[in-house]
């Protein structure tokens, strides 16, 4: 799980308050509310959860122009690369039913595009921090949700 070491580090950090949610859509709404109250939230979410949270992201954070950056851990990207597949693979029935593909990864980026969420994908751990910082800065500058997809393990 890419998120586990990150949650451990965040939970131990003295100046970060970790707020967990029961559902991913709830996390989006809570972050938008925190932003509205003057906080600077960062949503940490797996790409499967991103797909579940669509209505909250569209109907709350995006519509209100909430500067809420998302760190999206990229389930399925390693498996996709191992199978020789790129994120822009045509999403045909044959592709989506392949047993060697976790379709979460190839659906993540088109979904963000459809929702109008700017994103950047990082596939190497050494660039993860810079990618996340760019998403945070972009959210603040553009006053909208943004995303950093971390498609590599974080140690």
Which functions belong to the PLM regions below?
Residues 1-155:
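Thiamine diphosphate
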């Amino acid at each position: 799980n890419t998120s586990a070491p990150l949650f451990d580090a965040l939970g131990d950090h003295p100046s970060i308050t970790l707020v967990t949610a029961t559902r991913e859509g709830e996390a989006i709404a809570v972050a938008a509310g925190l932003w509205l109250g003057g906080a600077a939230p960062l949503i940490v979410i797996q790409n499967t959860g991103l797909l579940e949270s669509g209505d909250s992201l569209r109907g709350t954070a995006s519509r209100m122009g909430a500067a809420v950056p998302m760190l999206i851990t990229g389930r399925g990207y390693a498996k996709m690369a191992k199978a020789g597949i790129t994120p822009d693979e045509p999403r045909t029935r044959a592709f989506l039913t392949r047993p060697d593909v976790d379709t979460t990864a190839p659906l993540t980026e088109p979904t963000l595009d459809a929702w109008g969420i700017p994103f950047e994908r990082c596939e190497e751990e050494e660039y993860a921090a810079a990618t996340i910082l760019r998403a945070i800065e972009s959210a603040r500058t553009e006053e909208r949700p943004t995303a950093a997809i971390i498609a590599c393990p974080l140690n």
